[in-house]
């Protein structure tokens, strides 16, 4: 089953390689979508893919790269669009 989710990650998640870590996790799991820094210091991610792959991807987001400190992850389910063709850093 294909699912789509939006994540907003808070904590020490900018200037620690979080977007590149997220891009690598998406490639590893075959997840499509994008990641971007938000002006308020959080990171936003939209992910679409197989439900099990998105769950594994989410576990990676909750852990983060070595220098990050993930304090909060807000998750919203979305309707999969099928429009994503890869995973990009915005």
What are the residue ranges of the model-derived segments?
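Intrinsically disordered, low-complexity, mixed-charge
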Residues: 1-90
